[in-house]
Amino acid sequence: MPYFPAVDKVRYEGPDSDSPLAFRHYDADKLILGKPMREHLRMAACYWHTFVWPGADMFGVGTFKRPWQGSGDPLELAIGKAETAFEFFSKLGIDYYSFHDTDVAPEGSSLKEYRNNFAQMIDQLERHQEQTGIKLLWGTANCFSNPRFAAGAASNPDPEVFAYAATQVFSAMNATQRLKGANYVLWGGREGYETLLNTDLRQEREQLGRFMRMVVEHKHKIGFKGDLLIEPKPQEPTKHQYDYDSATVFGFLQQYGLEKEIKVNIEANHATLAGHSFHHEIATAVSLGIFGSIDANRGDPQNGWDTDQFPNSVEEMTLATYEILKAGGFTNGGYNFDSKVRRQSLDEVDLFHGHVAAMDVLALALERAAAMVQNDKLQQFKDQRYAGWQQPFGKSLLAGEFSLESLAKHAFDKDLNPQAVSGRQELLEGVVNRFIYF
């Protein structure tokens, strides 16, 4: 029996449509830069916010009344939840989904129960994928919610907790491989500290490094062809998390020789919590060669926490998509909606309203970003601004042909007196606005 009987399949109706259950800009097969929109964006709906979150917050219990969140046999409820999820994905017309292990299967009271429940639910997910054509963008393991992970998973002071987390990741990686997932994500929700008074930073970093090496080894052992992705976040739930931002993750990966093995999954709201723009985090990851995928959402600038609202800024998403297109587009990654309806959005149709509007935002941003790439005035200005480094003197500097002493002698001999030139920020901001708001 359908859970959303009043909702038909969402279709493209064009910019003049007034329907909140129709796309105004997302025309899945429309060609942009020679490739369909759906292939550029690779959009996914997440299992956890859409079907697991009960509408609770730290001040109140859940406000949603979802049938699968009631009482009953946990496995039967999980099976019903999966049926509802794929009904939603299909009617929404989204191509991908994402999950944590315990989103889709009851955790049980032991590792054996966990393994058996998860195995049965992977059978269910595989069947639904075959029937609907919906694909898995990425899988992951929830190694942060259970009280055993209060002090972390890989960074936990108890090696048995480390082993338990490794077992979950082992299972979730194997499930992702079986379901033909495009990526596997590692979010260190509690890989950090609350206070330095009881924390050995060197010890915990070594544990994290060992854990990630094991993950990489297992990827190659099972022949997983997708990307491994760390998801940076500066804090929350811990006071300080070790995967603070893209640059921090890169330093960690370099330390353990993993910079060619693991990339990043960048979340917009995590970027702003770290004091960065979403644009900054993407550009940084691209420049370091570790860009992988995106969690699309937004935070509230007046709140200092992770609100996970649906993206609604065409400007922000245009600049993000511009950087992604300039880098060659997604390889295995995509735009995963790590977004949730608000606690007062009680009706089932609200799930559609949030996703439809956000998918339209990304589609419009893609069109604007493609126009920027085709007439790349920003790159033209950058080429001009850095032109000196393409001249013989600039090239010799980067090639290491000068020591500090010989370079100082060169400056004295040439009586160098370089002058500042305009960075043209206001001009370039106007250029971007003309592309977005034409």
Curated annotation (Swiss-Prot):
* Enzyme class of the recorded protein, top EC level: isomerase
- The catalytic site is made up of 100, 103
The Gene Ontology CC terms held by the record are: cytoplasm
What does the record give as cofactor?
A: Mg(2+)
The UniProt record gives the binding positions of Mg(2+) 2 as: 267, 270, 306, 308
The cofactor binding remark recorded in the entry reads: Binds 2 magnesium ions per subunit.
Which GO biological-process labels does this protein carry?
Answer: D-xylose metabolic process
* Compartment(s) where it occurs, according to its Swiss-Prot or TrEMBL record: Cytoplasm
Its Enzyme Commission number(s) read: 5.3.1.5
Q: Which reaction does it catalyse?
A: alpha-D-xylose = alpha-D-xylulofuranose
Q: Which UniProt keywords apply?
A: Carbohydrate metabolism, Cytoplasm, Isomerase, Magnesium, Metal-binding, Xylose metabolism
Sequence positions that bind Mg(2+) 1: 231, 267, 295, 338
Q: Which Gene3D superfamilies does its entry note?
A: Divalent-metal-dependent TIM barrel enzymes
> GO MF annotations for this entry?
magnesium ion binding; xylose isomerase activity
Q: Which PROSITE patterns match?
A: XYLOSE_ISOMERASE
- Record's family? Belongs to the xylose isomerase family.
The record describes its quaternary structure and partners as: Homotetramer.
* Protein name per its UniProtKB record: Xylose isomerase
Q: Which organism is it from?
A: Pseudomonas savastanoi pv. phaseolicola (strain 1448A / Race 6) (Pseudomonas syringae pv. phaseolicola (strain 1448A / Race 6))
**Name of encoding gene:** xylA
